[in-house]
């Protein structure tokens, strides 16, 4: 598994906008071409997206993959996102994943906790992509 490419259905769905997903360069916001949704995207670009796809690294036993989204929890206990794809990285010696994370929590280096599919809490860190 390559934790680099964003996958429709995992990292993003129809519920997300292209700016959350890192696809701003495909939106042609500056060239004046009109299309359905352009005004909404301009507003999101002005205000900033509510969520963003980021990498996460976290400890614990090796994951064989992420079958269901795993909660990303801020230091105050608030769920601020979800890990949508993940696996053990032998090169980094930890679990890595892609996550949709809320504004204010997506800066690389931010300390987080991941709740795995067994309910165990794992210490983690938000990271830039690619790893």
Question: Residue ranges of each PLM-predicted region?
Answer:
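Conserved, structured C-terminal
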Residues: 4-131
């Amino acid at each position: 598994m390559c934790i680099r490419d964003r996958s429709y259905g995992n990292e993003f769905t129809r519920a997300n906008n292209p700016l959350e997903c890192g696809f701003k360069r495909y939106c042609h916001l500056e060239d004046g071409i009109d299309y359905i949704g352009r005004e909404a995207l301009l507003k999101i670009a002005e205000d900033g997206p509510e969520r963003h796809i980021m990498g996460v690294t976290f400890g614990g036993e090796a994951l064989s993959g992420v079958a269901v989204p795993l909660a990303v929890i801020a230091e105050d206990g608030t769920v601020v996102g979800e890990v949508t794809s993940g696996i053990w990285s032998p090169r980094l010696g930890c679990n890595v994943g892609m996550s949709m994370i809320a504004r204010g929590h997506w800066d690389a280096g931010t300390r987080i906790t991941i709740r795995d599919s067994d309910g165990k809490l794992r210490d983690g860190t938000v990271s830039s992509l690619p790893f």
